[in-house]
Each structure stands twice: as structure tokens, then as C-alpha cells.
Amino acid sequence: MAFKRLLIEFGQGVDMHGGNQNNAILKATQDAVHHCCMAGISEVFEIKDRMTQTKVHADIYVPHPEQADPSVVTNYLDWWPIDAEVHQGGADPRGIAFDGDPETEITIAIVVLTVYVDA
């Protein structure tokens, strides 16, 4: 059988202070996961072995891809076989400095999770 897409889910994560790409990536991944329930994995496709019959691909979009660590996503979703790619994207608007804090960068990451099943 061939792998086919079951789900494409999007998540947004924001690091409000300091522009940390990986904090924003983790929040975006959690956001995407919290928006879906894949009952069809077991009830429709009768998947018994998630590690051989499913896979996940993550597209990670951040303003500074050179600072991004894709293992943030793969470690968080370690109960699935997963691969991840980092792309230029997201947003980094200027934030507000409090009490003279020079770190004013806001980082917004987008994570797109695509779940495939062997169907």
C-alpha cells in the first residue's frame, strides 16, 4: 500500500520577548496538535502499529531559519515517525521594551503538520 494524507493541521506560536525561534516553534507545534483528534487512525484505517503504518511531516516557518532546531518538533512528537523541514517565513514584528529591556523582538512561527497513513 501507499502512504496517503489523512490530515493537514496548522499551528501558530509566538515568543513575545527575545525572539527565540525554538520557543515559538514549540508553541506552534503544540497549537497544531491541540486542534485535532485523529480518531480515524484507529477507527477507520484500523492502524495497529503507528510506527510503521503512519508518518508525519512538519514544515516549520520562522523568520530566522538558521536559528531554528527542527528537533524541537521531532522530540515533541516522538510517538510518531516524523521528519521536519525549516523554511523562511513566520514574522518578527517589533515588540515593546519594558524597563529598558533591549530585547523587543517578537517571533511568530507557523508549523504545518501533515499526517500520512499507509492505506
Go through each PLM region and give its residues.
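Conserved mixed alpha/beta catalytic, RNA-binding, or beta-rich assembly cores of soluble enzyme
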Residues: 2-48, 65-69, 73, 107-119
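Generic structural hydrophobic/aromatic packing signal, biased to beta-strands
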Residues: 8-10, 56-60, 84, 113
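Short glycine-rich, basic-tinged beta-strand/loop micro-motifs
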Residues: 49-63
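A generic structural signal for short, solvent-exposed coil/turn residues
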Residues: 50, 76-78, 105
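A glycine-rich helix N-cap at a beta->alpha junction
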Residues: 68-88
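C-terminal edge-of-domain segments
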Residues: 82-119
